């Protein structure tokens, strides 16, 4: 049983977002009861997977819409082992747990009849499609890693782990959800093989993966080719990420940190999506994210962080990330990790690889 314990929140510019780690033990009786009751409505799509809705007010058109969006993810023979997708309006395992893929093994092979639970489903929840893509990523990877490499549970023994350089990080599988190897792999599926429509979700634009301290999937040499060779599938039609821009810290004042970068290019010729975010870990069980406003002057983009806000929040160092995403959801980033006691040291510094902040 594998679960995704992430809270996603949309915020206005320069507002702090707190993402609490861990899983709540509070259980909602209504959702548990729904497990043993007939769904309010069902719809079986073209792949044979059934959407089972326990959400009041959802009609057949809504279920068809969710299935159509689900089908935009990269899907192969592994779909035959997925039976259904449950939609629940509440959070039986706490609000940090928004989805689960239910795995089971028979004679060291994935068993048929697997299913996905989605929690907190409703018209006011924009994250359902992102969660569904992530949970299907679990299904996808468990199937192919087992079929091609004989892997059941220990992803660190896989070729994937080698290409992703997971052995370079002491935090891997330390109990923190974002450092779980299986969760990192599912996030990679979303980025490389997920639905291009995820770009419509604002939180996906600035958080294409849960772990902000690892390179994005498109930044890892050979990772896309590995997914292709593992599954025999090619993913999205657009299989190129944007060019990586140069992020620079250009000015430090008592009031703020000021950044800029030049407009970058993409093979599609379509407009790119730029996001700036500051990430830090003030305590071991929480993450603070600062969404930063962006302005454009000619071909130059600018953004800033309020030093007063950082002081009020007692932030000592921060990872500033520029994320550039094309219209298919392919993303790259540049990052500057700044010690706020001496930010002037980072003027015009070449962006460094992402590092884990403690």
Protein language model regions, located:
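Active-site scaffold of zinc-dependent metalloenzymes
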Residues: 93-129, 142-143, 262
């Amino acid at each position: 049983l594998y679960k995704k314990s992430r809270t996603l929140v949309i915020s206005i510019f320069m507002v702090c977002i707190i993402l609490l780690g861990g899983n709540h033990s509070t259980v909602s009786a209504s959702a548990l009861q729904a497990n043993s009751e007939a769904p309010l409505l069902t719809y079986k799509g073209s792949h044979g997977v059934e959407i089972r809705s326990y959400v009041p007010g959802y009609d057949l058109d809504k279920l068809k819409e969710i299935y159509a969006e689900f089908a935009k993810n990269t899907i192969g023979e592994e779909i035959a082992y997925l039976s259904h997708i449950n939609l629940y309006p509440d959070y039986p395992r706490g609000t940090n747990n928004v989805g689960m893929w239910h795995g089971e093994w028979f004679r060291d092979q994935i068993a048929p009849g697997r299913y996905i639970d989605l929690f907190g489903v409703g018209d006011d929840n924009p994250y359902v499609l992102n969660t569904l893509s992530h949970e299907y990523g679990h299904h996808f990877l468990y199937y192919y890693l087992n079929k091609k490499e004989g892997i059941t549970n220990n992803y660190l023994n896989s070729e994937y782990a080698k290409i992703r350089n997971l052995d370079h990080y002491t935090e891997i599988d330390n109990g923190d959800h974002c450092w779980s190897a299986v969760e990192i792999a599912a996030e990679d599926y979303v980025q490389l093989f997920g639905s291009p429509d995820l770009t419509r979700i604002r939180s996906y634009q600035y958080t294409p993966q849960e772990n902000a301290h690892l390179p994005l999937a498109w930044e890892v040499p050979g990772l896309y080719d590995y997914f292709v060779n593992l599954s025999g599938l090619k993913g999205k039609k657009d299989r190129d990420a944007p060019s990586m821009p140069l992020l620079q810290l250009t000015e430090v004042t008592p009031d703020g940190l000021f950044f800029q970068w030049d407009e970058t290019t993409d093979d599609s010729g379509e407009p790119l999506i730029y996001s700036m975010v500051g990430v830090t870990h003030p305590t071991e069980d929480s993450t603070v994210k600062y969404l930063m406003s962006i302005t454009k002057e000619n071909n130059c983009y600018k953004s800033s962080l309020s030093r007063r806000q950082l002081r009020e929040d007692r932030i000592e160092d921060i990872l500033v990330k520029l994320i550039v995403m094309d219209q298919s959801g392919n993303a790259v980033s540049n990052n500057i990790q700044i010690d706020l006691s001496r930010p002037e040291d980072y003027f015009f510094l070449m962006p460094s690889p992402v590092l884990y902040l403690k």
